[in-house]
Amino acid sequence: MPELPEVETVRRGLEQKLNNFIIKKVEICRYSTVAFPTNKEEFIKGLRNSLIYKWDRRGKYLIAQLKEVQNEHTQLPLENSQNNGFLVVHLRMTGYFKFIENSSNPCKHTRVRFFDKNNNELRYIDVRSFGQMWWINNDLSLNKIIKGLGSLGPEPFSKDFNANYLKKVISKRTKSIKAILLDQTIVAGIGNIYADESLYSAGISPFREARTIKKNELIKLKESIVTVLKKSIGSGGTTFSDFRDLEGENGNFGLQTNVYRRTGKECRKCGNLIERQKITGRSTHWCPKCQK
């Protein structure tokens, strides 16, 4: 599943490529992809003649702020124009966007297509079809419609995410620290890859009970999380299967991982063999010598 760095990579690509993209036509190829409104024609009608004004990210969610366009001669930019709600996207396991100039026939796993007046297309492709989209108008609350969005913990790059916060939320937790990092209500956007890599960087065993981790270790863990995420974003995220950026390129961070998917290989620090075991149903990779 795309995690924070992959979703941020997509966000940056969308922001760069779709500057002043006005949606003139929407085609839904798989209706189950649209989670809200339940009336799919309302989704299409709501997005038509909307300018994708700004792309944001919250955890693993992409959020496009929309502006209403009265006619084709409307002057850009539209800072003071009326808002037209939000287009929210969760890529889930295999979803990704592709920008296509002079649109061609859709490929097999195309789920939703957005066109501008010049027939340029923003195409959403999803092999396993777990991804979802929402169009939410200004009269409704994003957090109420999308329950997962409203329950997210702080962003790893935010001031709210620090050692004091971590100490408070884990003080009575008997869960493993790996399970804590995967909990989106505690910290948003971290998944299996970056939990493993961050714990390795911090020298903390993924099996440690969260409440046993000391303040100085949490300081290092927070710093490791930020460093690992920034490094991955700089490499365009990680591709092990389906993830692609807007240009169809793979992410390159997978070539730099220290433990993730390196089972049986030598630790880059100590030479000990990397091991793998499941925690809460998720494959976990670690170095038994470097992580305590």
Swiss-Prot record:
Question: What name has this protein been given in UniProt?
Answer: Formamidopyrimidine-DNA glycosylase
What's this protein's function? Involved in base excision repair of DNA damaged by oxidation or by mutagenic agents. Acts as a DNA glycosylase that recognizes and removes damaged bases. Has a preference for oxidized purines, such as 7,8-dihydro-8-oxoguanine (8-oxoG). Has AP (apurinic/apyrimidinic) lyase activity and introduces nicks in the DNA strand. Cleaves the DNA backbone by beta-delta elimination to generate a single-strand break at the site of the removed base with both 3'- and 5'-phosphates.
Q: Where are the zinc fingers (FPG-type)?
A: 258-292
Return any one Pfam family short name. Answer: zf-FPG_IleRS
Q: Which cofactor does it need?
A: Zn(2+)
Provide a Gene Ontology MF annotation, just one: class I DNA-(apurinic or apyrimidinic site) endonuclease activity
The similarity annotation says: Belongs to the FPG family.
Cofactor: binding details: Binds 1 zinc ion per subunit.
Listed EC numbers: 3.2.2.23, 4.2.99.18
> Keywords, A to Z?
DNA damage, DNA repair, DNA-binding, Glycosidase, Hydrolase, Lyase, Metal-binding, Multifunctional enzyme, Zinc, Zinc-finger
HAMAP family from the xrefs? Fapy_DNA_glycosyl (MF_00103)
Q: Tell me the superkingdom of the source.
A: Bacteria
Q: Which residues form the active site?
A: 2 (schiff-base intermediate with dna), 3 (proton donor), 60 (proton donor), 282 (proton donor)
Assembly, in brief, is:
Monomer.
Catalytic activity line of the entry: Hydrolysis of DNA containing ring-opened 7-methylguanine residues, releasing 2,6-diamino-4-hydroxy-5-(N-methyl)formamidopyrimidine; 2'-deoxyribonucleotide-(2'-deoxyribose 5'-phosphate)-2'-deoxyribonucleotide-DNA = a 3'-end 2'-deoxyribonucleotide-(2,3-dehydro-2,3-deoxyribose 5'-phosphate)-DNA + a 5'-end 5'-phospho-2'-deoxyribonucleoside-DNA + H(+)
Instruction: Please list the residues that bind DNA.
Output: 109, 128, 173
> Biological process (GO) annotations?
base-excision repair
Q: Which organism is it from?
A: Prochlorococcus marinus (strain AS9601)
Which positions carry the signal peptide feature in this UniProt record? none
